[in-house]
Amino acid sequence: MADYQTIYTQIQARGPHITVSGEWGDNDRVGKPFYSYWLGKIGDAQIGPIYLGASGIAAFAFGSTAILIILFNMAAEVHFDPLQFFRQFFWLGLYPPKAQYGMGIPPLHDGGWWLMAGLFMTLSLGSWWIRVYSRARALGLGTHIAWNFAAAIFFVLCIGCIHPTLVGSWSEGVPFGIWPHIDWLTAFSIRYGNFYYCPWHGFSIGFAYGCGLLFAAHGATILAVARFGGDREIEQITDRGTAVERAALFWRWTIGFNATIESVHRWGWFFSLMVMVSASVGILLTGTFVDNWYLWCVKHGAAPDYPAYLPATPDPASLPGAPK
């Protein structure tokens, strides 16, 4: 007889698809699911059916348009040479308009395509959010996933639209591309006095580490007590059995305090939400209320004022002959 393993799923449950009472009553599923043996090794083996609906189709259409704009502009950088496109893919990018355009509409070849790609990407994310929210309501679920996703969308809007608007230049936006967007992150930090001194950046990183710690601790705990039925978490919320009692005792022995089966999920949801919220606040404060985070920390006693041993290095962009 097969036994249940907690490191990987050895038993794959397959049976008739059970309908769920939704917003419009009991309805049969549209589409026929199929099964994947290998995906069943790490999760549910059933694939589909997938429901797109109007908002899902719109999200797919807008997203595909944004991706095509980005890829065609990347290909144009290497004169549509397929070999060079794949060879240099990580270095190719679609860049925002130059600072000289401010908040104006630039020509397509000089940042206009970046604006169009950003517009379609925003429409795609917004349409997908509507889909996530409406599917949750149709199934009678809470809308927790939708609001976490909304926080992530807000962060994307902050770095690509809201922050450039507040400082008055599209050039502050993030380029599309693998290395280009990482280069932007480095330049953004240097321009505003080392972003690591921004407290909200620290909060965001702290919440991100907290998410990893919470998920690791919770996942390991449930796997450890699965032999006692701890994987049936919904039942254990209202009727604690030996699994939860053992898990709680372990954590009280270890750190003196334990979460409940319900509260640990609330912590994870809140921490993941605050990763994006904290990062968004930091972006919005940068360049608007704080021009140099290091000097801001020195002023408020949060960082040491290092003596200048070497002469100040001028900004290369301010030197005569530099491109404007």
From Swiss-Prot:
Fe cation binds at H218, E233, H265. A ubiquinone binds at W251. InterPro entries: Photo_II_D1/D2_sf, Photo_RC_L/M, Photo_RC_L/M_CS, Photo_RC_M. The chain crosses the membrane at residues 52-76, 111-137, 143-166, 198-223, 260-284. GO terms for biological process: photosynthetic electron transport in photosystem II. It is found in: Cellular chromatophore membrane. It is a multi-pass membrane protein. Keywords: Bacteriochlorophyll, Chlorophyll, Chromophore, Electron transport, Iron, Magnesium, Membrane, Metal-binding, Photosynthesis, Reaction center, Transmembrane, Transmembrane helix, Transport. (7R,8Z)-bacteriochlorophyll b binds at H181, H201. Residues 2-51, 138-142, 224-259 are cytoplasmic. GO terms for cellular component: plasma membrane light-harvesting complex; plasma membrane-derived chromatophore membrane. One of its GO terms (molecular function) is bacteriochlorophyll binding. Gene3D superfamilies: Photosystem II protein D1-like. Pfam families: Photo_RC. Residues 77-110, 167-197, 285-324 are periplasmic. Reaction center is composed of four bacteriochlorophylls, two bacteriopheophytins, two ubiquinones, one iron, and three highly hydrophobic polypeptide chains (designated L, M, and H). Belongs to the reaction center PufL/M/PsbA/D family. The reaction center is a membrane-bound complex that mediates the initial photochemical event in the electron transfer process of photosynthesis. This is Reaction center protein M chain. It comes from Blastochloris viridis (Rhodopseudomonas viridis).
